[in-house]
Amino acid sequence: MCGKCVALCPVGVDSCGLKQAQRAVVNNSLPYDYKFLSTAGHAGAAPQNNDNGVLYFAGCMTHLTPAIIKSMTKIFETAGEKYLFADKDGGVCCGRPLMLAGKTEAAKEVIAKNTQNIMESGCKTVVLSCPICLKVLKEEYNLKGITLLHHTQYINNLIQQKRLVLNKTAESFVFHDPCELGRGCNIYNEPRNVLQSIGQLKKAGKEKKESICCGGSLGSLTLDYNDRIKITQESLNILTCNNPDKIVTACPLCLKTFSDQSSRPVVDIAQTVAENICNGCIKQ
């Protein structure tokens, strides 16, 4: 379900859509049902006025990689952003795992509750660190009047607006295009712009729409663990062919998956940005 087959299919067959539709028919036969996600969380954002600024929707996986949340908090504070957390006390599921498991009705309930929380927050912009959440909110939620941004887009905007100034380092980076961010949301340039403002950006063996999945896909419900590891190792080999100092990604699932197998440092782009903020360079 990484989307590469769809992106490269010469006749445009939506194999991911076909798989998901089939799972909705046979969902009782799947080994995982994600029942623990069927109850929506409560967004921590309380309505205050007509524009509370930015709502940060971290999501389930980002709460398992707290360094991303810590880094985003520093970025918000440095930029002088008015912001609220949608899920400060625990990850709010976007509904995607339920959809992938064929639990369509349960997913609709989660989506309806999250939509209500977002609309009642008073925020006009939602920033997400998880590209899986971003894709679902774009495609499945009715959020009229709300701007949805992945944190790479948001950070890139801050840099262009000179609300965030970064130090230049001698480090070299390679960027891994997460499946849902690249092939799913067509976001390729913003993360590269951000990294080039910090250090040297090296090329991977396969990039953009040809990028290899990290191996941690939520959609591969029956894939053997050893097969997942093979995918992860293949992706790491492709990413490190030009010997970068660090592997940078922009998805909490990719970060967690790569970090477990890589001998080289793996970080989220928000961490790289937060570590290289030029203190005292921004005039508030």
PLM regions with names:
Residues K4-Q284:
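Iron-sulfur cluster-binding electron-transfer modules in prokaryotic oxidoreductases
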